[in-house]
Every structure is written in structure tokens, then in C-alpha cells.
């Protein structure tokens, strides 16, 4: 089965509104065709509405970096999936290691978010990944499989076929370290095998799996050549327009 690549930036808590607007203006007319690749930027919620307006008519898609699992209520400071979708946003990132570590999000929280995001009409980008300690102990497969099983609990086969899973080894995020292409592909293969165990081969062949962790323009082509890697979730290299476009150059 042919899976369309998806290259997604994750700005985290960076940029001002004017900087975000300038970025969209710089990239929107220079992106490869969406027939070849999905080009996505994950931005702080404050910027999503003006970015959605500016990107009209372009190939750029947008992701929120988080959402809550309720669509309304007394949840001060949270953003609902329904409100995010109403802005025209296509994707919502959930389960990032920074959310798990700093905001104590659990697998159960992340699973509830996945269900709410699908119900609202967006697509989750579900993150998973292990610490250096887990990696060095040889327990990566066990850890990542557990995160995937918990994150997908109760989702339908159709939903899982359409979502995106991002494998990000925590020890390679923002550290300058990166897993070898072989390690990245092997662990993305573990993710795919876990999906196959839960939902069957047809679903596992449909789900798109990204690698994330210090991905750069000079390393992305080797990663994308691997069998189980369908895209990248990119932090630092997505912050500048030139660098983001360089990540997509192979698809032009």
C-alpha cells in the first residue's frame, strides 16, 4: 500500500504572531504538491486562526500542538478539539513527551484526547517514545508498544487507519542526537507490528508513522527511504521558512 508522506513541523512555544504570519507568507507559494506530500505546521493555538486565513489556497496544512478531551466546560486555559477544528485546522498533536513529562499527561488522558479529536473531525498525531534509560536497557519495543496499545484503546479500525503516529525517542529531541536510520526504522516497525496485532494487516499498512528527533534537511532523505517511516515530526528545523522548505525539497 502506498502511504502519502507527511512532514510536520512542531514549533512548540516559539514565535510571535508577526513571525508566524511572516513564515506562512514565505512558504505558502513554495510548497510541493499535496499529491506528493502533506506539508504541516504545528503552531501555538494563539496563531492558528490568522495562519489558517493566510494559508488559504496553498498546500499548507495546520496542526494544533495539544487539545483537551472535552468540547466545552469549566476548564480554564484549555482548547477544545471542536473549537480548533472550527478554525480549519486539520491535525492535533497529542502525547508529546514534553506534555507527558511537564504536564503529567497519562496514556488514559491521551487516549481520551484521540477519541475527542476524531469526534470533532480532525486527525490526531499520536506521539510515542522512550527515554535514554529505557533505550539502553533494551526495552524500547516493550515501552513503545505499551504506549500505542493504551493510546489506541477503543478506537475503530477506520480511525486508526487514518491517524498518524509519531515515534520520537526522548533522548533525541532537541539534543542534537538522532537515532540511526536503522534504529528509527526498526522502532517504527515495532509501532506498525503493534497496530497489526491490534487491528490487522490492512490497518497496519494504512497507518502513517513519522520519525521525530533532531531531524534536519541533511538527514531527512535517508530516514524517508526506510520501509516503515512515512514522515517526520520536526522541531528546530521547522522554525525557519528556508529550513522547512528544505525538508520538503525532495518532493518537488
UniProtKB/Swiss-Prot annotation:
Residues the entry annotates as binding substrate: 10-12, 174, 214, 235-236
Any Pfam family hit: TIM
UniProt-annotated catalytic positions: 96, 168
UniProt enzyme class: isomerase
GO cellular component terms attached to this protein's record: cytosol
UniProt GO MF annotations: triose-phosphate isomerase activity
Catalytic activity: D-glyceraldehyde 3-phosphate = dihydroxyacetone phosphate
Subcellular localization, as worded in the UniProt entry: Cytoplasm
Protein's pathway: Carbohydrate biosynthesis; gluconeogenesis; Carbohydrate degradation; glycolysis; D-glyceraldehyde 3-phosphate from glycerone phosphate: step 1/1
Main subcellular location: cytoplasm
Record EC number: 5.3.1.1
Source taxon at top rank: Bacteria
A GO biological process held by the record: glycolytic process
Subunit structure as annotated in this protein's UniProt entry: Homodimer.
Family: Belongs to the triosephosphate isomerase family.
Free-text function comment from the UniProt entry: Involved in the gluconeogenesis. Catalyzes stereospecifically the conversion of dihydroxyacetone phosphate (DHAP) to D-glyceraldehyde-3-phosphate (G3P).
Name recorded for this polypeptide: Triosephosphate isomerase
